[in-house]
Amino acid sequence: MEELKALRLKEKILEIELNSVKMQIHAYEESLKATTVNSVQEGEILQTESIPECPAQGKETPNPVKADSLLKTILGNERQNPLEGKSSKLVNLTPKSDKDKVKSSPVANGSGKDSTNPLNPVALGKSKMTILGQKQADEEEFKPDYLRAASNGQSWFAVYKGPNKEFFTEWEIVADICKKRQKSKRFRSKEQAEVSISLYNKDIQDPVNFLRPVKLVKEERAAQPLKFKAIAAEQTIQFDEFRQIWEKSRLSDLEDGVQEKFYTNDSASKSTYTFVENAEPYLVHTAFRAGLAKVIYPSPNLQELKWFPEGIVKAIKNFRKKVLNAKDAAIFIKIFSSIPDWVQSTRYEPYHFIQIGIAKTKKELPSSKVCKEEFSVQSLNKVRVQSLQTISQKLQEINEESSIKVNYCSSTCIMVSKFQKKTSTEDLKLVGIFESNLVNIEQLACGDQTKKEWCRIVRRTYQKHLCLYCKDKADSSSTSGEQNNVEKSCPDSPLTNAYDERSDDHKRIPSI
């Protein structure tokens, strides 16, 4: 319904313009007809008046309407003679002979080219001016209103927005309004300004309703990153998926590595992945969640890290921006990870210690060899404890004398890089918090079997360590008569001390 009203309004506007054009054409035709008729009638009248009467033979009288006589009377006493080049005084207006009479007669000189011919443009100037004036009057009579306003120099200014939303005829008022960042438009008639304002208000109040729903491509593209973020937020891995990625690392050969842009670092206990540019992002992220990713050489656009947590990707981008040599150079991401753990339906994330820096040369794909598959729950517990010990050793290397900067830190991941200055106090606090999460067995995200094995290793490194697993072992030893052996294993931690009284023997970690 709204579209029909708009079309009818446009139809009325076009009809008005068509009528104005027709009126112009009619005015021009009428003026041309009037010009032609008046010119013919005026010429006949002048020709009739300029022909002298033929007197009877022997009765020649001077004709006062003669062109020569009339012209001499108007011009005055002197006239330049073109034949003699001298001025002669006019004494008598009467021609001296028939010879002069014939020369001055318009009948004898019918061509109308003689200077004394009354049909000369000089003589017809007055009548022509009268005809032109009549033509202009006819045109003004049939001219539309907006053309009359244009000829008079009148303008209408339309203001579309603001409190002064109307049309004006004075530019001074419109100029003051335009200083307030309001737009205006100039028209030659009031009708055009009114139509323009009405159409503008209609477009604002009634938005365009398309016959078919328009599907925007940008909405579909904007939905994809949200989908990626939701999936990437799931950092845990199922046991079946872990077993597949574990077997892939042990059984992959050179052909698989070249095709999928990775190679494996094989040892007796496990195999880890090293990914190069253009590796499959999902495979890289799966290996990271499984704790089997060792080194990543990402592309300049970091497409391999598309499924990683947002905080890790943002920290790597900031590192490339702030480090001058890393803007265009290749970088490496070296990862020390533990193995995830599963207890019935509960899944625990692995711990990660990440180092980033500038890669010296591009990595070539070395040959990967097929290893013997050794997959069991007991072997996984052993590998998990060894990987936690490796992360703990990397954290102990950071102290006040080292030049390390912490780029990212969370409950299960810490990212560091080399720095030109000494490690700051804030970074040391972050390292201490992350290390306390590993040492505090009660807060460690893993199963009981892993906690018991990890407690045994922590007691070797931190002499003042005391946890519930230490107390359980001490209680069982006291009942069996092995109190002395328990005291040797924990010489600085008496069994009477509560768990709250434990303190880390790590001087470089500030108090938190």
From Swiss-Prot:
Organism superkingdom: Viruses
Keyword terms: Host cytoplasm, Translation regulation
Biased amino acid composition, Polar residues: 476-487
Region (Disordered): 76-123, 474-512
Record-level GO cellular component terms: host cell cytoplasm
Chief subcellular location: host cell
Transmembrane segments: none
Biased composition (Basic and acidic residues): 499-512
Gene Ontology terms: biological process: regulation of translation
Subcellular location: Host cytoplasm
Further comment: The inclusion bodies are the site of viral DNA synthesis, virion assembly and accumulation in the infected cell.
Protein family (similarity comment): Belongs to the caulimoviridae viroplasmin family.
General function of this protein: Enhances the translation of downstream ORFs on polycistronic mRNAs derived from figwort mosaic virus.
Record's protein name: Transactivator/viroplasmin protein
Organism encoding this protein: Figwort mosaic virus (strain DxS)
